[in-house]
Swiss-Prot record:
Positions contributing to substrate binding: D99, G100, S101, S102, Y201, K226
Predominant location category: cytoplasm
Gene coding for it: fbp
Family classification: Belongs to the FBPase class 1 family.
Cofactor names: Mg(2+)
Protein name: Fructose-1,6-bisphosphatase class 1
Domain of life according to the entry: Bacteria
Sites where the protein binds Mg(2+) 2: D96, D99, E232
Keyword vocabulary terms for this entry: Carbohydrate metabolism, Cytoplasm, Hydrolase, Magnesium, Metal-binding
Molecular function per GO: fructose 1,6-bisphosphate 1-phosphatase activity; magnesium ion binding
UniProt xrefs under NCBIfam families: PRK09293.2-1
Substrates-to-products reaction catalysed: beta-D-fructose 1,6-bisphosphate + H2O = beta-D-fructose 6-phosphate + phosphate
Amino acids binding Mg(2+) 1: E78, D96, L98
Length: 290
């Protein structure tokens, strides 16, 4: 893999994690391909969800590997109540081992989301983020100074492109229960569809955001407070911002950056809007003041 594009003080830890993922992809794929991988367990995780078997197997595999890195001080899975902490190290990892697990049985795209934090689990301390998506091919996307896309082939990640969103896209991934959408959001969505936008919502956040990124524009939204800040929202918000898009929420009708949100508890949830510039402008126009 070509690491020359990685710059800045966090480049080395990103390279270490990518090298670890590169070595572990086949094991992860093996976990996902087991016949009972999508079967639900009888457990409940810290967020109140019932994990599937692949959730727990991937979580265990990733935790062990992340903790093996000398410069990692803390590892925190969405499946756990609290982080696992070591004595030494500078960086903290928060991750969702299997985003989209609820649609895995339908053979939809799923993935692993990783946020790399410094000093503390706060949005302002997010140094970089990565995700791996598993489908008919395996891809890695990295947000550092820019956003880089790779494809896994013959045991290595191969560079595809640097992702930069265009001003306007053509797809909408609108999650949540539509009967609970605000009037402003309903009008915004009607406007998008009147302009021939295509609905591309799968139920897997990492898949839908990946679609927006590789298509170079569009909008992902989840207006209900369901998505976890540390494990999903912040890492993917960084992705979209570094790709020249916007990542935001609305607080009493005022548009605010997701990466300026505070974290009162580890498993706190948030609404989430990730969009290219045009879609962000339209959403603000209709949702402002609500």
């Amino acid at each position: 893999m070509d690491y020359k594009c990685f710059k800045g003080k966090h480049a080395n830890i990103v390279i270490e994690i990518i090298s670890l993922l590169e070595k572990g992809v086949k094991k992860a794929q093996e976990i996902l391909e087991k016949p009972d991988a999508g079967s639900y367990t009888k457990l409940e995780n810290s967020s109140g969800d019932t994990p599937i078997k692949a959730d727990l197997a991937l979580d265990k595999f990733l935790e062990e590997n992340f903790l093996s890195l000398e410069n990692i001080k803390s590892v925190f899975s969405e499946e756990k109540e609290t982080p696992v902490t070591k004595e030494n190290g500078s960086y903290l990892i928060a991750y969702d081992p299997l985003d989209g697990s609820s649609v895995m049985e339908a053979n939809f795209l799923v993935g692993t989301i990783i946020g790399i934090y410094e000093k503390d689990y706060k949005a302002q301390n997010l140094a970089a983020s990565l995700y791996v998506v598993f489908g008919h091919k395996i891809e890695l996307v990295v947000a550092l100074e820019e956003v880089y896309r790779y494809s896994f082939y013959q045991n290595k990640f191969h560079f595809i492109e640097t992702i930069v969103l265009e001003n306007k896209g053509k797809i909408v991934a609108s999650g949540g229960n539509q009967k609970d959408f605000s009037l402003g959001l309903k009008k915004a969505l009607e406007g998008f569809f009147a302009e021939n936008y295509r609905l591309r919502y799968s139920g897997s956040m990492v898949a839908d955001v990946h679609h927006v990124l590789v298509k170079k524009g569009g909008m992902f939204s989840y207006p209900q407070k369901k998505l976890r800040k540390l494990f999903e929202v912040f890492p993917l918000a960084l992705m979209v911002e570094k790709a020249k898009g916007e990542a935001f929420y609305f607080d009493k009708g005022v548009k605010k950056r997701l990466l300026e949100q505070s974290v009162e508890n580890y498993h706190e949830k948030s609404e989430c809007y990730l969009a290219s510039q045009h879609e962000a402008h339209i959403l603000e126009k209709y949702l402002k003041g609500e």
